[in-house]
From Swiss-Prot:
This is Phospholipase A2 inhibitor NAI. SUPFAM superfamilies: Snake toxin-like. InterPro entries: CNF-like_PLA2_Inhibitor, LY6_UPA_recep-like, PLipase_A2-inh_b-type, PLipase_A2_inh_N, Snake_toxin-like_sf. Heterotrimer of 2 subunits A and 1 subunit B; non-covalently linked. It comes from Notechis ater (Black tiger snake).
Length: 201
C-alpha cells in the first residue's frame, strides 16, 4: 500500500508551468485548503487541481493536489488505468484562471467484464524496470499504456516510477526531461493496441 501512496503523489508531478500564483496544498481525501501559494515557474501556465484515486482491492484511497501545472497536463483532464490484480489508478484534472480550482469529482467505477484483451501491468516505485504481471482488460479498455519517469529531490538518487496497464484511450502527454535540482521528468509515454487473449489449448 505504501507504493500506491507514493505513486499517487508522484504522478501529478510529472509536468510542472508562468503567469501567476496558485494555491498549493496536498491532502488525503476529497478536499484541501491552504493560505499558501506558489509562483508558477516558467514552464507552468495554469493553476489546477488533481483528484487521484488508487485502489487495490479491497482497499482504496483518494488524494487531492492543488498547484501550478503545465497546459499539456491540463489538457489530459482525466485518466483511468487498470494495472491488473483488481487495481486501478484514476485521476481527474481541472485547471482554471483562478488561484483555486475546484476538483472534478469521480463517478463510480462502471460495472464491466473482461473483454478478451490483456496488457502488461506494473505499479512500480524507485525503478523504471519493475517486474510485470498480466492486466486483464475490461469493458472499453483496448489500449496498453506505459508511463515512466522520475522525481528529482534532495536524495542521492532520483525517485523513479513506472506505470503500465489497460486504458480506454491514449493520453496526449509530452516527454518532459528536466535537469532542474527539484524537477519532474516524464521519460516514457507509450500507448499501443492491447493483445487478444489466446485461448488455452
Amino acid at each position: 500500500m505504501k507504493s500506491l501512496q507514493i505513486i499517487c503523489l508522484l504522478f501529478v508531478l510529472v509536468a510542472r508551468g508562468s503567469c501567476h500564483s496558485c494555491e498549493i496544498c496536498h491532502n488525503f481525501g476529497k478536499d484541501c485548503q491552504s493560505d499558501e501559494t506558489e509562483e508558477c515557474a516558467s514552464a507552468e501556465d495554469q493553476c489546477g487541481t488533481v483528484l487521484m484515486e488508487v485502489s487495490s482491492a479491497p482497499i482504496s484511497f483518494r488524494s487531492i493536489h492543488r498547484k501550478c501545472f503545465s497546459s499539456s497536463l491540463c489538457k489530459l483532464e482525466r485518466f483511468d488505468i487498470n494495472i491488473g490484480h483488481d487495481s486501478y489508478l484514476r485521476g481527474r484534472i481541472h485547471c482554471c484562471d483562478e488561484a483555486r480550482c475546484e476538483a472534478q469529482q469521480f463517478p463510480g467505477l462502471p460495472l464491466s467484464f473482461p473483454n478478451g484483451y490483456h496488457c502488461p501491468g506494473i505499479l512500480g516505485v524507485f525503478s523504471v524496470d519493475s517486474s510485470e504481471h498480466e492486466a486483464i482488460c475490461r469493458g472499453t479498455e483496448t489500449k496498453c499504456i506505459n508511463l515512466a519517469g522520475f522525481r528529482k529531490e534532495r536524495y542521492p538518487i532520483d525517485i523513479a516510477y513506472n506505470i503500465k496497464g489497460c486504458t480506454s484511450s491514449c493520453p496526449e502527454l509530452r516527454l518532459n526531461r528536466t535537469h532542474e535540482e527539484h524537477g519532474n521528468g516524464l521519460i516514457k509515454v507509450e500507448c499501443t493496441e492491447a493483445s487478444k487473449i489466446t485461448p488455452s489449448e
